[in-house]
Amino acid sequence: MRRFVWVSLSVLALGCGSSTSGGSGTGGNGGGGGAAPQSLVNGLRVSEVSIYQGLKIPLEVEGVPVDPRPTPVVQGREALLRVFVQPNPDWQPREVIVRLELSNSQGLVGAQEIRRVVNGGSVEADFMSAFNFDVAATDIAPDTTYSVGIYEVEPSQTAPSPGSRFPETGVAWLGALDDGPQIKMVLVPVQWNADGSGRLQDVSEAQVEKLRQQMYKMYPVRKVDIRVREPLSWNQNVSAFGQGWGELLQTVLYWRQDDLKNNVASDDEYYYGMFNPSNSFFSYCQQGCVAGLSSGSVSPKDSFLRGSIGLGYPGEYTAGTFVHETGHAHGRLHAPCAPFGQIQSVDPAFPYGDGGIGTWGYDLLTHQLIDPGGASKDMMGYCDPTWISDYTYTALFNRIAAVNGVADVITLAPQKSWQTISIAADGSLAVGVPFRVRGTPDGEPREVEVTGPGGSSRTVTGYFYPYSHIPGGMVLIPEPQAGDRAVRIGGRHLAL
């Protein structure tokens, strides 16, 4: 949940993805016909090669490959590749050619060259001080290799400097990993009938595209697939401070389960219910509000929890809530950043105490670098502006890969019916919706006392899933038997 209280450059592309982020404003007439220049440069070396797919992923530093990588290179996802250069003390500024070659098991895929004057060393924050190549998604494959070299514009008899090419000979492995073809999202417009208005959300192509772009920029995916479902009619109140949110979330999750049963949804789809409980965001949230809700999904096999809800008012904040809540549905807890420190369910393993992003970010759509020392914080906190940390990015990659890659294994587990018991913020209990779950749930085990026929008592194990932003959650218990009359959880009694 969230709460409220380039410069275009000239580049020569040779049979590879076009480059729109790098190069020189005055140069751009590099080697022709795809052949590499003849003479490696003297007095200048490749100090670093990094690739950016939302975050910076260093590939080599001072001639040494980075292994292991801090975050994965995602197969089939477009990228910016930056070549950093460092001159020797006696370097005389002059024009050089930096060439990137990409290959695969079949040979050379293509090459790009950038030609411009080098006056000094590359600096991360100075975009134009590095040589920046856009790499097409199709050129980032499991068998992709690369090499970079700095060449003299004119043939030279001077011996090249160490480090003028990486690797010194041959090619280096790019190391792209696969997490599946896409992330699938289903928007569920909630027709708001609690006040008799029948109010619906903006699910126009333009608004859906805002959601898609926000998720694509941050999530480690090739593609974000979004479809819009038929509306869900809702007659109950959902208050700004949490009452009614859990009931609506469970209903959206139950609709997903029903759609699966009727073969109109797939198990790898995440549902997102959008609702407008007032005419405007301000009128609903003028004194603060809950903006979205999910249930913490511990394991990839908790497919029944692949859903969230959030406010659906037009604007950028809806997109921010969308990616935040979907992060919860992928098992992410909160990053430790919120106004006045008011935040629950903080991830104890989050590596940055201020909720920061940890490394340089890069917006693939606006072509802007995001400074980790700046204002941006991880999207799983409550602070704005947001980006994504390397910690969250890697965790999402692993979860998305599991969802896309282990479906055949998951279907081998038998399905059983489990009854949901809702726990409200005040600890009171209510009977929720039933879910079909494969295998044993992975929530927190809770002891549940069941009162059976004739007042008999037995103890069963329930599994608790907390809500992402409000107190409470839901406990899954084995389907009640005939004659079961009541349950007791944490000292609270509920008649069935």
Locations of regions flagged by a protein language model:
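Solvent-exposed serine/threonine-rich low-complexity stretches and specific carbohydrate-binding patches
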Residues: 106-126, 230-233, 456-470
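Active-site-proximal segment of zinc-dependent metalloprotease catalytic domains
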Residues: 175-344
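Short beta-strand elements
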Residues: 154-194, 493-496
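The catalytic-center signature of Zn2+-dependent metalloproteases
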Residues: 121, 138, 304-386
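Short, aromatic- and glycine-rich surface loops/edge beta-strands on solvent-exposed regions
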Residues: 139-164, 448, 480-494
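Ser/Thr-rich, Pro/Gly/Ala-heavy low-complexity intrinsically disordered linkers and tails
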Residues: 1-39
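Catalytic cores of secreted or luminal carbohydrate-active enzymes
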Residues: 376-427
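Contiguous beta-strand segments within globular domains
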Residues: 46-97, 413-443
